[in-house]
């Protein structure tokens, strides 16, 4: 009887279940969206029970539609939207408040206060992160400070905290396992990435009782088994977990030091594996844990680009330049260049390496000769320029030159963008056959833990190339184009 690994990809707008076979190929998948709540401007929340319901629904869909039985699932891997925070009652299992999503800015006042008290360097030294509403620590503090009775219950040991992986493992195991993995713990602003434990001093500053926190385990590990009443009468090992970007790095088989991947989604997330050493960034990058496996922890440098695919959506929905995003490629290829036009898509500020939340989107170099095609091409090129900003910061911090860039996400179907990316970086860009690398990474982590796959070398052999984009641009032209981008960013930042 053939067996499979079930990967649960719990994202910001939907939950997906994907069944993988021994060759790392997709057998079946299901997806279900859930509600986004915006109680105030800048706030983003989810209903944690609704997320759980969506996960159960996609698992049921995959099992019933694929025709396999639950006994054929060798293990379950989880990958999740990172930083999103759930606090729930240990006895009843009910969340005390909505899940506060990674995008939500509702803790900006808390962050401002912590920065004013001079804590930024302390958090950075221990966690590799900045004090920012993005991360979980201030979200937990906000819930304890703002939900009636929450702090008292937390101090009595009655409340639990978890990122989405922790919440799902707790629910799937019937409340038996309160755990997280190293990659998710490293995004909380409460975990010391050098000592590999929750940091008492940081917990004290944030006012978060240690009793709320999950046990931190390797990313490839049998955490618990599912309770049978949710899983068709079977106890299935829950055996792997990683935050979505780290999971994509694993799914792209970036196992060696200096290997990197860029995910082109709503924004871009670029990660470079730095091996067993954590590199402290001097250039606006985050230092994070890639995964913990085989008794060792791998670290990564991470750069965040806030606007990527959403810039293409803006051309489609806001400016109505085309009806389907896939048409952006053919429009861009109708012209030889942007004719000097630069689009800086800073709709919500700029991320790595600038970290400027006040700058706004700008367009430079317009003339009477500028056409729709020039504008579309310039917007697509902005994704590649921002990626170069991040890669330059990574190479400066690590003294490692990237040999190839592996790519995934929705925008990688755009051949024009991928070729321009390779040209600009002067590095080959590799697009894999399977674009679902985030879900695949979680499947691999679970599969290794249950012996479905032997080790990372077996997985590396499964990585198959769809297309390699070799750089073709002359150095002089590349430098000239990038200098124009740098001028445009500088001008955009000056205009506030």
Swiss-Prot record:
It is an enzyme of class 2 (transferase). ADP binds at residues 12, 16, 266, 309, 410, 414. SUPFAM superfamilies: Actin-like ATPase domain. Sn-glycerol 3-phosphate binds at residues 12, 82-83, 134, 244. Pathway: Polyol metabolism; glycerol degradation via glycerol kinase pathway; sn-glycerol 3-phosphate from glycerol: step 1/1. PROSITE patterns: FGGY_KINASES_1, FGGY_KINASES_2. Changing residue 230 to R: Increased activity. It comes from the Bacteria. One of its GO terms (cellular component) is cytosol. GO terms for molecular function: ATP binding; glycerol kinase activity. Keywords: ATP-binding, Glycerol metabolism, Kinase, Nucleotide-binding, Phosphoprotein, Transferase. InterPro entries: ATPase_NBD, Carb_kinase_FGGY, Carb_kinase_FGGY_CS, FGGY_C, FGGY_N, Glycerol_kin. Its EC number is 2.7.1.30. Pfam families: FGGY_C, FGGY_N. The phosphoenolpyruvate-dependent sugar phosphotransferase system (PTS), including enzyme I, and histidine-containing protein (HPr) are required for the phosphorylation, which leads to the activation of the enzyme. Key enzyme in the regulation of glycerol uptake and metabolism. Catalyzes the phosphorylation of glycerol to yield sn-glycerol 3-phosphate. Homotetramer and homodimer (in equilibrium). NCBIfam families: glycerol_kin (TIGR01311), PRK00047.1 (NF000756). This is Glycerol kinase. The gene is glpK.
């Amino acid at each position: 009887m053939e067996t499979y690994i079930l990967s649960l990809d719990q994202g910001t707008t939907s939950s997906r279940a994907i069944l993988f076979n021994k060759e790392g190929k997709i057998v079946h998948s299901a997806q279900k969206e859930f509600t986004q709540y915006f109680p105030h401007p800048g706030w983003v929340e989810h209903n944690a029970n609704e997320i759980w319901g969506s996960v159960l629904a996609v698992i049921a869909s995959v099992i019933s539609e694929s025709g396999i039985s639950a006994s054929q699932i060798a293990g379950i891997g989880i990958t999740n939207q990172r930083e999103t925070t759930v606090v729930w009652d240990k006895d009843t299992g009910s969340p005390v408040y909505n899940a506060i999503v990674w995008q939500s800015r509702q803790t900006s006042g808390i962050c401002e206060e912590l920065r004013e008290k001079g804590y930024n360097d302390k958090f950075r030294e221990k966690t590799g992160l900045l004090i920012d509403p993005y991360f979980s620590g201030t979200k937990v503090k906000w819930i304890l400070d703002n939900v009636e009775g929450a702090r008292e219950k937390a101090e009595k040991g009655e409340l639990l905290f978890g990122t989405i992986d922790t919440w799902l493992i707790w629910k799937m195991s019937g409340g038996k396992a309160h755990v997280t993995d190293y990659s998710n713990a490293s995004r909380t602003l409460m975990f010391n990435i050098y000592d590999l434990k929750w940091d008492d001093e940081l917990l004290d500053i944030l006012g978060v009782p240690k009793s709320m926190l999950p046990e931190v385990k390797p990313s490839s590990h049998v955490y618990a088994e599912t309770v049978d009443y949710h899983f068709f009468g079977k106890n299935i090992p829950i055996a792997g977990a990683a935050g979505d970007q780290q999971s994509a790095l694993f799914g792209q088989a970036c196992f060696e030091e200096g290997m990197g991947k860029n995910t082109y989604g709503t924004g871009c997330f670029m990660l470079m594996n730095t091996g067993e050493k954590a590199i402290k960034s001097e250039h606006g990058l985050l230092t994070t844990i890639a995964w913990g496996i085989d008794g060792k922890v791998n670290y990564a440098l991470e750069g965040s680009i806030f606007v990527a695919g959403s810039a293409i959506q803006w051309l489609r929905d806001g400016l109505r330049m085309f009806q389907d995003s896939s048409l952006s490629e053919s429009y861009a290829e109708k012209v030889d260049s942007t004719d000097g036009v630069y689009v800086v898509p800073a709709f919500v500020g700029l991320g790595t390496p600038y970290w400027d939340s006040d700058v706004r989107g700008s367009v430079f170099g317009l003339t009477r000769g500028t056409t729709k095609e020039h504008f579309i091409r310039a917007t697509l090129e902005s994704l590649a320029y921002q990626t170069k900003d991040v890669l330059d910061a990574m190479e400066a911090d690590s003294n490692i030159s990237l040999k190839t860039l592996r790519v995934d996400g929705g925008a990688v179907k755009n051949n024009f963008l991928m070729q321009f990316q390779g040209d600009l970086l002067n590095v080959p860009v590799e697009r894999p056959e399977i674009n679902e690398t985030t879900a695949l990474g979680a499947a691999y982590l679970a599969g290794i833990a249950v012996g479905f796959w032997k080790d990372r070398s077996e997985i590396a052999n499964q990585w198959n190339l769809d297309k390699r984009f070799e750089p073709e641009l002359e150095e002089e032209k590349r430098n000239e184009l990038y200098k124009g981008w740098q001028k445009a960013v500088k001008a955009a930042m000056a205009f506030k």
